[in-house]
Amino acid sequence: MTALPTDFLYSEEHEWVNTSAVVEGETVRVGITHIAAEALGDIVFVELPEVGSEVEAGEAFGEVESTKSVSDIYAPVSGEVVAVNEALEDNAGLINEDPYGEGWLYEVKVTEAGELMEAEAYQAANE
């Protein structure tokens, strides 16, 4: 079983940001948790936002498709997308293999934090 990184923050919709304190103007990396990845099953495709586009906390920005279903992915913070993980185009399964590392989705320059929780609270909400 994959452990939640304790220095990340999490959304109720199972996304993470790679910081313990979201600061306006800071760039953070975003992904989905192992809990979401395990629930989805084998991920075969992911739709990511365009670089330069704006995402809004709590709003859907793309989809993840698995052998079981298609699900929306929600932005945990608002801001401008500055990079996307192009490796996912050829191997969306990286999300299953390494959700907190090589399976990241995009990087965003934060304009506003969404409602995020620490690892302990996220874990408790998903037991």
Curated annotation (Swiss-Prot):
Q: Which residues form the Lipoyl-binding domain?
A: 27-109
The record's Gene Ontology cellular component field reads: cytosol; glycine cleavage complex
Which residues are annotated as modified residue N6-lipoyllysine in the UniProt record? K68
The record ties this protein, via PROSITE patterns, to: BIOTINYL_LIPOYL (PS50968), LIPOYL (PS00189)
**Keywords noted in UniProt:** Lipoyl
Cofactor(s) annotated in UniProt: (R)-lipoate
Please list the GO biological process terms of this entry. glycine decarboxylation via glycine cleavage system
Which SUPFAM superfamilies does the record match to this protein? Answer: Single hybrid motif
Mind telling me which InterPro entries this protein's record contains?
Answer: 2-oxoA_DH_lipoyl-BS (IPR003016), Biotin_lipoyl (IPR000089), GCV_H (IPR002930), GCV_H/Fam206 (IPR033753), GCV_H_sub (IPR017453), Single_hybrid_motif (IPR011053)
CC cofactor note: Binds 1 lipoyl cofactor covalently.
Q: Specify the superkingdom.
A: Bacteria
Subunit structure, as described in the record = The glycine cleavage system is composed of four proteins: P, T, L and H.
The UniProt family comment states:
Belongs to the GcvH family.
Protein's job: The glycine cleavage system catalyzes the degradation of glycine. The H protein shuttles the methylamine group of glycine from the P protein to the T protein.
Q: What PANTHER family has UniProt attached to this entry?
A: GLYCINE CLEAVAGE SYSTEM H PROTEIN (PTHR11715), GLYCINE CLEAVAGE SYSTEM H PROTEIN-RELATED (PTHR11715:SF3)
List the protein's name: Glycine cleavage system H protein
